[in-house]
C-alpha cells in the first residue's frame, strides 16, 4: 500500500504534514510518496528517509488557498495536487491526501481521474462521531453547493456503499436532512428527493432534523454540499467550544480530584469532545471518482494527517471506487434501481 501525500497544503505545512505522514508510515506499515519541495522534505524528514519506505517527488509549484481551482490545476501542472492525483491515475499510488485548496483537489480528481461511469456528481463523505464510538457519514460535506433531487439520491447510494465498507455497517440507515420529519415538509429539493429515496431499495428511514444528527438517528446523512459543509463546520465549532469548557473545568477543579458524578460527567464530555474532533477522522473521502482521494482539513496538525492516511488506507483496501462502479452497473442492468444488498460488497 502506497499513499501519496501533499506536504505543501495546509495551514501547518510542511512540518506538521510530514510529521503526521511519518507517524502513519510507522503505525500502518505503508509506503509513502511525499510531494513537495525536495530540500524542505529532507530537512523535516531527516533520518526517517532511510528507515522508512518513503519516496520524495519534487514539486516546484504550490497551489495556494486563494487560487481559483481550475486555473490553479491548469496553470500549475508541477504542483503536489496535480502530481499526486496523477500518481493515483497511473497506479503508482493507491491513494492521495491533501490538506490544501479543496477546490483544486476536487478539480484535479475530476479532470485527471474522471468520474466513475454513471456518477453525475461526486460528493465528499465526512465521517462524524457525535456519540462515543458510533460514527455516521455526512454526504455531501461540501463538493456540490447546488444540487438536484437525483444528485442527492446518488449521494445516498454512494454513502450506502461507503458506510458498509469503511464503517462496517451491514444495512446503513439512510436519512434525508430536512427542516422536519414529516414527508410533506421541506423545500422542492428535499420533497422530490424524499420520493426518490422512498422508492429506492436503500434502508431509507425518512427525513431527519438537525438535532437527530447528535442522536445518531441515521448512519448516512444525505444533504446538499452547501448545507452539509455548514453542518460539518458547526459540529467542529461545537467540539472546539466543548474542549474549551472542559479545560476551564479542569482549571477550576485543579485543587481537588473529580469524584462521583463529576468524574462521570467529565469522562462523558471527554468522549463527546473526542468524537467531534475533526482530527480523529482526519479527512473526507471524495466518492464517485476513479480512485481514492482524501481531503484533509486545512488546519490539520500531525494527528489529523496520520488519521487521514489511515482512512485513505482503509478506503483503498476496500476498493470502494470499484464497488461503487459495480453497484451502478448492477442497478443499470436491472433496468431499475435494484437492491444494493445484492451487490457483492462484503463488510
From Swiss-Prot:
Gene Ontology CC annotations of this record: cytoplasm
Top-tier EC class: transferase
Domain of life: Bacteria
GO biological process: fatty acid biosynthetic process; phospholipid biosynthetic process
Gene3D superfamilies attached to this UniProt entry: Isopropylmalate Dehydrogenase
Enzyme Commission no: 2.3.1.274
Main location: cytoplasm
Matching InterPro entries: FA_synthesis (IPR003664), Phospholipid_synth_PlsX-like (IPR012281)
Pathway of action: Lipid metabolism; phospholipid metabolism
Catalytic activity: a fatty acyl-[ACP] + phosphate = an acyl phosphate + holo-[ACP]
Gene Ontology molecular functions: phosphate:acyl-[acyl carrier protein] acyltransferase activity
Keywords annotated in UniProt: Cytoplasm, Lipid biosynthesis, Lipid metabolism, Phospholipid biosynthesis, Phospholipid metabolism, Transferase
Subcellular location: Cytoplasm
HAMAP family registered for this protein in UniProt: PlsX
Quaternary structure (record): Homodimer. Probably interacts with PlsY.
Family the entry assigns: Belongs to the PlsX family.
Biological function: Catalyzes the reversible formation of acyl-phosphate (acyl-PO(4)) from acyl-[acyl-carrier-protein] (acyl-ACP). This enzyme utilizes acyl-ACP as fatty acyl donor, but not acyl-CoA.
Protein name: Phosphate acyltransferase
Organism this protein belongs to: Dehalococcoides mccartyi (strain ATCC BAA-2100 / JCM 16839 / KCTC 5957 / BAV1)
Gene (name only): plsX
Amino acid at each position: 500500500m502506497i499513499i501519496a501525500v501533499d506536504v505543501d497544503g495546509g495551514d501547518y505545512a510542511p512540518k506538521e504534514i510530514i510529521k503526521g505522514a511519518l507517524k502513519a508510515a510507522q503505525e500502518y506499515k505503508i509506503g509513502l510518496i511525499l510531494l513537495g519541495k525536495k530540500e524542505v522534505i529532507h530537512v523535516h524528514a531527516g533520518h526517517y528517509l532511510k528507515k522508512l519506505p518513503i519516496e520524495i517527488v519534487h514539486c516546484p509549484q504550490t497551489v495556494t488557498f486563494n487560487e481559483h481551482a481550475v486555473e490553479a490545476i491548469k496553470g500549475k501542472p508541477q504542483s503536489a495536487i496535480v502530481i499526486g492525483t496523477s500518481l493515483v491515475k497511473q497506479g503508482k499510488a493507491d491513494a492521495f491526501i491533501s490538506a490544501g485548496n479543496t477546490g483544486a483537489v476536487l478539480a484535479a480528481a475530476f479532470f485527471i481521474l474522471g468520474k466513475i461511469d454513471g456518477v453525475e456528481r461526486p460528493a465528499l463523505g465526512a465521517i462524524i462521531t457525535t456519540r462515543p464510538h458510533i460514527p455516521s457519514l455526512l454526504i455531501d460535506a461540501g463538493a456540490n453547493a447546488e444540487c438536484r433531487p437525483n444528485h442527492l439520491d446518488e449521494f445516498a447510494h454512494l454513502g450506502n456503499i461507503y458506510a458498509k465498507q469503511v464503517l462496517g455497517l451491514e444495512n446503513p440507515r439512510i436519512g434525508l436532512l430536512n427542516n422536519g420529519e414529516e414527508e410533506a415538509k421541506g423545500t422542492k429539493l428535499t420533497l422530490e428527493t424524499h420520493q426518490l429515496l422512498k422508492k429506492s431499495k436503500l434502508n431509507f428511514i425518512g427525513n431527519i432534523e438537525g438535532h437527530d444528527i447528535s442522536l445518531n438517528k441515521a448512519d448516512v446523512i444525505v444533504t446538499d454540499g452547501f448545507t452539509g459543509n455548514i453542518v460539518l463546520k458547526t459540529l467542529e465549532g461545537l467540539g472546539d467550544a466543548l474542549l474549551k469548557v472542559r479545560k476551564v473545568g479542569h482549571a477550576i477543579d485543579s485543587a481537588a480530584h473529580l469524584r462521583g458524578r463529576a468524574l462521570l460527567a467529565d469522562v462523558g464530555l471527554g468522549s463527546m469532545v473526542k468524537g467531534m474532533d475533526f482530527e480523529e477522522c482526519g479527512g473526507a473521502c471524495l466518492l464517485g471518482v476513479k480512485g481514492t482521494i482524501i481531503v484533509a482539513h486545512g488546519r490539520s496538525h500531525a494527528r489529523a494527517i496520520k488519521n487521514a492516511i489511515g482512512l485513505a488506507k482503509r478506503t483503498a483496501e476496500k476498493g470502494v471506487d470499484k464497488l461503487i462502479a459495480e453497484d451502478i452497473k448492477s442497478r443499470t442492468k436491472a433496468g431499475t434501481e435494484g437492491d444494493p444488498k445484492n451487490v457483492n460488497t462484503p463488510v
